[in-house]
Amino acid sequence: MLLTSGQKQRPRLAQQVYRFMLDQEPLLGAAAITVHHRRLSTDGVVGWQQQEDDLEFLVEVERDLPKADYILTLIHELVHCRQTLEGNLENESREAEAYRLESIYAERFAA
């Protein structure tokens, strides 16, 4: 389940990306994921995720990103949600995998 907040267009795009990601990463379907769209530039990041409960995640994404960057960022953070569900908490391997998969999945999403 995906819940979103923020601008009119971003929640719609977030739903599209999430539905696509369920096909790529079926384990995401076991979690409740909330996506907040907000200004993160002052924090020096464009997105992050945190586990709220065993099967609940909060993903925050910079609201002013260009569409392509928004898609990459949301995919990246959803990969982190799946990694957490699997118990992969080692930061270096998490980031390497998320960066590798974000490009692959973004290309598939655009096709």
Language model features by range: what are they?
Residues R10-L13, I71, R94:
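Hydrophobic (often cysteine-bearing) scaffold residues that line and stabilize catalytic clefts
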Residues F57-L74, N88-L89:
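Short pre-active-site segment immediately N-terminal to the catalytic Zn-binding motif
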